[in-house]
Regions:
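Short beta-strand segments within Ig-like beta-sandwich modules, predominantly Fibronectin type-III
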Residues: 372-378
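Beta-strand-rich modules
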Residues: 383-402
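Short beta-strand elements bearing conserved aromatic residues within extracellular beta-rich modules
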Residues: 361-365
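Extracellular zinc-dependent metalloprotease catalytic-domain scaffold
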Residues: 29-186, 192-326
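Extracellular acidic, Ser/Thr/Pro-rich low-complexity tracts
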Residues: 91-93, 351-356, 400
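Secretory targeting and sorting signals
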Residues: 2-28
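Conserved aromatic anchor
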Residues: 342-360
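Proline-enriched interdomain boundary motifs that mark the N-terminal boundary
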Residues: 327-337
């Protein structure tokens, strides 16, 4: 049965006479943006490997996007390795917007890290967002929106450890004691494009936090089928989920993985930059090309392509994740306000406190004077066709499908 929770009516009286406040059609009706602070790492493995994927086909591949890399302190041999990985992603990531990458070469402050990456920012509630309540990595958000949402900053930021024992010969054949830079960049660009959780963990209290879930987070499921993005935050319940078993629920990835939900890397001891944001090491480390997004790269191990599983997961990120299980009735939307304009009103509100546990599917803004309703997924809502000099009262209701 459908559940609806209404917020008490609030009045908009007399304000339309003078239109003292002009409805902020922009930027209020565009999108929200937050900085990206979580990094996805790839660590240096210790097991000498001869695992090598087949070289990319020599035929001309269709270019689906353009990447522009800003190099900071990179040696010439390394630039060629980076460009090779960029060319692979250009043929596999579809976007009409140039993906700018800020890449830095220097010693890592973390022992064992080969490379790290993060998106430039996260965006939500933009036109084209499959789920406006989730936060999309810059490059993915731009691809879905069809425009650059932040022209002042790069879409991806990558740092590479210059002190690692790299194969500098450019022959694509690292020895059993060398690491392949192209493979590291193939991995890190994946993080920058959105293969990344926005969670955090407090090891002292065992608390997990996920204040701004990404679509990546929304596709992660606990063993009992709950979405990671729907668990209370901060909470020990979320902390337990981050350090036990999580699987991917996207249909494309399940199909690519032989009908099995891919298992994610969630060790009992949480590892910042590795936990949650990688495929499980034990499950996929020997799976050839599908081990690209495991948390470590062994010496001698190389990849020339993302692999079917990673590409399927990236495709899932472009769709709306399945709705989670509602465990609560929707509470009222909070902090409703009305901004007036000429013959119009902009109604803004915040989601109810139990947005996740109630699985809110839409909001209904009702003009109590006329009886007309507007359904929306996000705030604010622009109401037009009002008569200047007339008082109006509106209500806002939250609804889920349970």
């Amino acid at each position: 049965m459908m559940r609806i929770k209404r917020m008490g009516p609030f009045a908009l009286t007399g304000a339309l006479i003078l239109a003292l406040l002009t409805a902020p059609t922009a930027p209020a009706l565009t999108f929200k943006q937050i900085p990206a602070t979580n990094w996805g790492h790839i660590y240096a493995g210790t097991e000498a490997s001869v695992t090598q994927t087949a070289p990319a086909k020599s035929k001309n591949l269709e270019i689906k996007s353009k990447f522009s890399v800003k190099y900071n302190n990179f040696p010439e041999w390394a630039k060629k390795e980076v460009q090779a990985s960029v060319d692979v992603w250009s043929a596999n990531f579809k976007s009409s917007v140039v993906v700018t990458v800020d890449a830095s070469w220097g010693r890592s402050s973390s022992w064992g890290v080969l490379g790290s990456a993060r998106p430039g920012s996260f965006f939500s509630a933009f036109s084209g967002a499959p789920d406006p309540s989730l936060w999309y990595a810059s490059a993915l958000a731009n691809a879905l929106a069809g425009k650059d949402l932040d022209k002042a900053n790069p879409e991806i930021v990558i740092q590479v450890n210059s002190a690692a024992p790299w194969n500098t010969r450019g022959d694509g054949s690292p020895t059993g004691s060398e690491y392949d830079l192209q493979s590291v960049f193939l991995h890190e660009i994946g993080h920058g494009l959105g293969f990344l959780s926005n969670d955090s963990y407090d090891p002292f209290f065992g608390l997990g936090s996920l204040d701004q879930p990404t679509p990546f987070d929304a596709y992660l499921q606990t063993s009992d089928g709950r979405r990671l993005a729907d668990l209370p935050t901060p909470s020990k319940e979320l902390g337990v989920a981050l350090t036990t078993s999580l699987v991917w629920s996207g249909a494309n990835a399940i199909k690519a993985n032989g009908g099995v939900k891919p298992k994610m890397y969630t060790p009992a001891r949480y590892e910042s930059g590795s936990s949650t944001s990688h495929l499980d090491e034990a499950t996929f480390s020997k799976s050839g090309v599908d081990s690209v997004m495991t948390p470590s790269l062994d010496p001698g191990e190389i990849f020339k392509e993302p692999g079917a599983l990673l590409l399927a997961m990236m495709e899932d990120l472009r769709s709306k994740p399945p709705v989670g299980m509602a465990t609560d009735l929707p509470l009222s939307p909070r902090n409703a306000q009305a901004f007036t304009g000429d013959s119009s009103a902009l109604i803004s509100f915040d989601p109810p406190a139990n947005l996740r546990t109630a699985q809110i599917t839409e909001y209904i803004v009702k003009n109590l004077k006329t009886g007309s309703e507007r359904k929306t997924l996000t705030s604010p809502v622009l109401i037009t066709g009002l008569k200047n000099g007339t008082s109006y009262t509106f209500s806002v209701a939250s609804k889920n499908g349970s």
